[in-house]
C-alpha cells in the first residue's frame, strides 16, 4: 500500500504575537508570547540561542489563541524581540499578519509511505513493514525529527498483536517551510497508515472490517510491542462492541437498502487506534530529536547500612 499524508498549514485565526521587555535594574527579560509551551520556549531560547541563565528570562503565555501545535516552535521573532528590548531599552511588540503566518509558520504532516502486511490463511497478522519518507522542510523546528520517529514509528503496532514490525523512516530537508507538531503530531499519521492497511487486508481476505480487527486485537496484558512501547491494559473487543452498538451496525443493511431506494449510496467505515500521550523518557526523546527535556522518573533506595542510592 502506498500512501501520501499531505502537508497541512495550521492557519490559526489568531496569528502569533509577542512583546519583549527588559529590566535593566535586575538584568532580566520578560517575553509575553502566544506560545503553547512557554517552558520549552524559555529553555531553548536561553540554552541554545541567547546563552543566558534560565532564571534571567521569564516567558508568559497569557492568551494563545489557535495553535494546533504550530505555536510550540521557538520562532526567530521571539528571540529577536527579547534581544532587541535590551538593545533599545524599551518594550517591543510584534504581531504577524495572516499572509506571513500562512507561509512561514510551522506546517504539519508531509509523509510519503509504503506499507506491507503479511498474514496467514485466517487473516492473522504475521509481520508489518513500513518505509516512510518524512519532509522536514528547510531546517529543523523544535519537534521536527521527533514527530516521524518516537511519535509515529512507535505507534505503528497499533492495538494489534503483530509479532514482527519493521519501520524505516528517512527524513529530508527540502525548500519548504519547516514541519513541526500538528494536531496529534505523528500519531494520526500512524493511525491513518495502519488502518488503511488493515482495511485493505480485510478486502484481500474477504473479511468484514469488524472481523479482521477482532482477529488481531491484543488480548493479553501487559503487552510488549515490537516497536518499544509496552501496553499495560486495554479491552479493544469491548470498545468495538460499544461502537457497533452506538452506530447500530445491526440495522445498517436496512438503512443501506432505504438509501438505495432513493438512489443514494450508504457505507460504513471502521478505524481504531491507540495513542501515546506525552513524550518520555527525556534521553530517548532527545536522542530522537525532541530538542527539549520532558519528564523523567527517579528511584531512591535506602540500604540496611543507612546509605542511600538515588537513581
Question: What do the predicted segments below correspond to?
Answer:
Residues 55-62, 89-99, 126-131, 162, ...:
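Beta-strand segments within the central parallel beta-sheet cores of soluble alpha/beta enzyme folds
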Residues 15, 25-29, 52-56, 88-92, ...:
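Short coil/turn connectors at secondary-structure junctions
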Residues 35-38, 62-67, 96-106, 132-137, ...:
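Acidic, glycine-rich active-site loops and adjacent beta-strand->loop/helix elements
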Residues 1-18, 110-197, 279-280, 284-296:
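Glycine-rich loop/linker segments at domain edges
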Residues 12, 69-121, 179-204, 225-250:
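Glycine-rich and small/hydrophobic secondary-structure elements
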Residues 18-88, 145-155, 183-211, 242, ...:
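Alpha-helical support elements that line or immediately flank enzyme active sites
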Residues 59-62, 173-178, 214-224, 303-308:
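Short acidic (Asp/Glu) and glycine-rich catalytic loops that position anionic groups and cofactors
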Residues 1-44, 145-161, 179, 235-285, ...:
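Extended, polar/acidic
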Amino acid at each position: 500500500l502506498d500512501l501520501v499524508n499531505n502537508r497541512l498549514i495550521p492557519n490559526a485565526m489568531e496569528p502569533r504575537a509577542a512583546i519583549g521587555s527588559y529590566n535593566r535594574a535586575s538584568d532580566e527579560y520578560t517575553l509575553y508570547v502566544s506560545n503553547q509551551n512557554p517552558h520549552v520556549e524559555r529553555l531553548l531560547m536561553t540554552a541554545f540561542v541567547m546563552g543566558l541563565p534560565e532564571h534571567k528570562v521569564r516567558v508568559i503565555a497569557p492568551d494563545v489563541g489557535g495553535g494546533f501545535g504550530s505555536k510550540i516552535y521557538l520562532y526567530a521573532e521571539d528571540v529577536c524581540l527579547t534581544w532587541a528590548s535590551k538593545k533599545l531599552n524599551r518594550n517591543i511588540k510584534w504581531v504577524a499578519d495572516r499572509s506571513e503566518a500562512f507561509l512561514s509558520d510551522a506546517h504539519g504532516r508531509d509523509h510519503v509511505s509504503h506499507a506491507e502486511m503479511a498474514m496467514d490463511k485466517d487473516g492473522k497478522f504475521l509481520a508489518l513493514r513500513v518505509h516512510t519518507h518524512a519532509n522536514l522542510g528547510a531546517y529543523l523546528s523544535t519537534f521536527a525529527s521527533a514527530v516521524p520517529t518516537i511519535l509515529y514509528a512507535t505507534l505503528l503496532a497499533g492495538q494489534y498483536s503483530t509479532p514482527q514490525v519493521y519501520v524505516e523512516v528517512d527524513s529530508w530537508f527540502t525548500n519548504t517551510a519547516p514541519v513541526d507538531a500538528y494536531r496529534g503530531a505523528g500519531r494520526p499519521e500512524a493511525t491513518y497508515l495502519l488502518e488503511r492497511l488493515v482495511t485493505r487486508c480485510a478486502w484481500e481476505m474477504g473479511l468484514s472490517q469488524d472481523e479482521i480487527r477482532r482477529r488481531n486485537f491484543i488480548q493479553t496484558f501487559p503487552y510488549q510491542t515490537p516497536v518499544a512501547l509496552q501496553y499495560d491494559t486495554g479491552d479493544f473487543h469491548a470498545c468495538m462492541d460499544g461502537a457497533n452498538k452506538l452506530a447500530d451496525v445491526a440495522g445498517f443493511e436496512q438503512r443501506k437498502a432505504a438509501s438505495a431506494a432513493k438512489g443514494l449510496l450508504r457505507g460504513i467505515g471502521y478505524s481504531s487506534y491507540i495513542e501515546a500521550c506525552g513524550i518520555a523518557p527525556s534521553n530517548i526523546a532527545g536522542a530522537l530529536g525532541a530538542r527539549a527535556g520532558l519528564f523523567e522518573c527517579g528511584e531512591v533506595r535506602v540500604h540496611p547500612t543507612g546509605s542511600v542510592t538515588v537513581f
